[in-house]
Amino acid sequence: MQDASNSIDISLAGLDTAEWKDKLIAQAQENGLYEPLGKNHFATFIDEKSTLLVTFETVQGIRTLSENAQPFGFDMVKAQGWSHLCIISDGDTWFRDSRVYGFFDHLIDDGFFEEFDKVVFYGAGPCGYAAAAYSVAAPGATVVAVQPQATLDARMTEWDDRFTHMRRTSFTNRFGYAPDMLDAADRAYVIYDPRQTLDAMHSALFARANVSRLRMPGMGDALQTRLVEMNILYRILSLAGVGKLSEQAFYRMYRARRDNVSYLRRMRSRLDGDERPYLNMLACRNVTSRMHAPQFRRRLVALEKQAEAGDFRPPPALL
């Protein structure tokens, strides 16, 4: 008999870290399994239907980004009835750990991934790297990686100075160079902002026949958060789970950026920085006509005063 107090429907929000981990482990054990993977990693598995979502997440990300302080994949379990394997790290480790290698070796040897009709790997940033790298364990999988690094091997990516503390970590042994690990995937989708130079350079390393590089220009360096805000990340994974994710489908969903305040603010700031008052006025008019946006209203008023002073020729007034 299942213990209702350990249902994944029970929120873990508000707990301290130790109690949170204990409750998460209990939920995993009640509905599947829990596997410790050394000091900095552990795995949870929820056993449901024949579609498996494999996510790579961090303790900090789960506790910060999830309203229920649960792994991202739990929402897909609840909504879609999917099975879910979550590999969790304490901090950003890029999952470069022999215990994690061994765990995936064990899954491969047991034919674990072969038990599922569809397997989807997902992660963002360092977790996106891991989603791509470990997807080789499940040939034919679909991979969705948001802002992934291809490798942090300094011989290949010495231009990336963001993660110099990882320079002593090997990215050349097991499950190492993420783009090569995608060769066994059915399809992979790498989501990035081309205006984030280092992210774009990593994205270029993923160029493969089976990889679609999906651009989110102007969205900044927190794409997973923006995707959640726009309510399209779950839709992306849902389409991936039924083999219907495509570039066209992604860009249709991405139209939601027009209502994303973070994106609109970045656009306004960019137009200010580029000294494009004409376009900025058009943008501010559009935003204030559709939503309550005091900052855009104030900027529009300021631009109108500049235009009246003859600083620039304004666009025609809206009818």
Specify the residue positions occupied by each region the protein language model found.
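Extended, composition-driven regions rather than compact fold-specific motifs
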Residues: 1-110, 114, 140-319
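Alpha/beta-hydrolase fold nucleophile elbow
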Residues: 115-125
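Glycine-rich nucleophile elbow surrounding the catalytic serine of serine-hydrolase chemistry
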Residues: 123-135
